[in-house]
Amino acid sequence: MALKIRLSRGGSKKRPYYHIVVADVRSPRDGRFLERVGAWDPMLPKDGPRVKLNEERIQYWLGQGAQPTDRVLRFLDAAGLKKRPARNNPHKGEPGKKAQERIAAAKQAAEDAAAAAEADSASE
């Protein structure tokens, strides 16, 4: 049985509240779970206690092979329970082909304009 440590949504409409649960991956998001190991209240201010974790039980479930989801892994990394690997995608921040062509054309136009301006100043 593959286990995930994930968020289960509670609360009312437009007032979310999430329980951090250990559940089978085949269970629905808000459905059956094995154990509730924490809570996250995103409506609280940033400096308040937004995330509550039962660290002892989370360590137990991680030892049993449970995999945290990305959002829960961020919480565990902030609490120092599990290290979140750094993403390595160096090409994501680069512009696409069309944007690179536009940049090259603008650079060429600027160089041509600078050369023309220098030629005009040299002839005078």
Curated annotation (Swiss-Prot):
Keywords attached to this entry: Ribonucleoprotein, Ribosomal protein
Pfam families, per the entry: Ribosomal_S16 (PF00886)
Basic residues biased stretches: 81-90
SUPFAM superfamilies registered for this protein in UniProt: Ribosomal protein S16 (SSF54565)
Region (Disordered): 81-124
Domain of life: Bacteria
Keyword Zinc among record annotations: no
One MF annotation (Gene Ontology) recorded for this entry: structural constituent of ribosome
Gene Ontology BP, a term: translation
Bias kind Low complexity: ranges: 102-124
Gene3D superfamilies linked: 3.30.1320.10
Biased composition (Basic and acidic residues): 91-101
GO cellular component: cytoplasm; small ribosomal subunit
Similarity field: Belongs to the bacterial ribosomal protein bS16 family.
Name of the protein this chain belongs to: Small ribosomal subunit protein bS16
Originating species: Bartonella tribocorum (strain CIP 105476 / IBS 506)
Name of the coding gene: rpsP
